[in-house]
């Protein structure tokens, strides 16, 4: 059909402008890798009173989120983080558009050794055998299948580097391989007054709502 886009759908999905096949790849993969050096900073928002989470804890229950690689018979853990506060906020609250800072904490994490990540941004996703829309598809089962494939195929990687579906900033999903190489440099309640101005700016920049200020 000349002059028209042809939509390919293998299963119901909101990523309707591209075809996302399940793994394994239909072509030879030539993966790209991205290394975060020792001392690199990652930011993470978590709920300290939920499931006994700490600043550096990996979630064992799942699969739930986009790149969860959990499977029966394996001790799998996942930790999601961003390189910026804006990435963390939109990843956590982008779906609702309302920043809920109650009971949440912001952790500043440092890597105690280099972290090797599979590059899924830009052409990286195609080099890995999929497409960049993998990071934004509403079909979580499909993206989880790919994460399990990446985890099994590349035992040297600590996780994946992908683009946030909300603002395309760099986001990280770390596998349990990186569980003991993260150090919490600092953590603050998300409603801490020192974060207030920055959160308001990010909320405005992303057309999100921020909660009223609290006294901390």
Segments the model singles out, each with a brief description of its role:
Residues 67-99:
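Extended catalytic/binding region for NAD+/ADP-ribose chemistry, centered on the ART fold
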Residues 2-67, 97-216:
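Active-site and NAD+-binding cores of ADP-ribose-processing enzymes
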């Amino acid at each position: 059909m000349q002059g028209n886009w042809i939509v390919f759908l293998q299963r119901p999905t909101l990523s309707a402008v591209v075809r996302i096949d399940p793994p394994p790849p239909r072509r030879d993969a030539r993966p790209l890798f991205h290394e975060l050096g020792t001392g690199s900073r990652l930011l993470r928002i978590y709920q300290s009173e939920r499931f006994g989470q700490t600043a550096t804890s990996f979630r064992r229950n799942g699969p739930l989120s986009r790149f969860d690689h959990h499977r029966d018979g394996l001790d799998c853990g996942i930790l999601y983080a961003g390189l910026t506060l804006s990435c963390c906020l939109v990843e956590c609250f982008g779906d609702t558009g309302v920043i809920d800072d109650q009971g949440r904490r912001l952790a500043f994490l440092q890597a105690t050794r280099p972290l090797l990540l599979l590059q899924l941004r830009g052409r990286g996703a195609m080099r890995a055998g999929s497409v960049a829309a993998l990071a934004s598809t509403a079909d979580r089962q499909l993206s989880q299948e790919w994460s399990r494939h990446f985890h099994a195929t590349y035992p040297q990687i600590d996780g994946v580097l992908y683009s946030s579906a909300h603002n395309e900033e760099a986001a990280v999903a770390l596998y349990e391989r990186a569980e003991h190489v993260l150090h919490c440099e600092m953590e603050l309640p998300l409603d801490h007054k020192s974060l207030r101005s920055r959160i308001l700016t990010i909320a405005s920049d992303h057309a999100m709502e921020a909660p009223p200020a609290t006294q901390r």
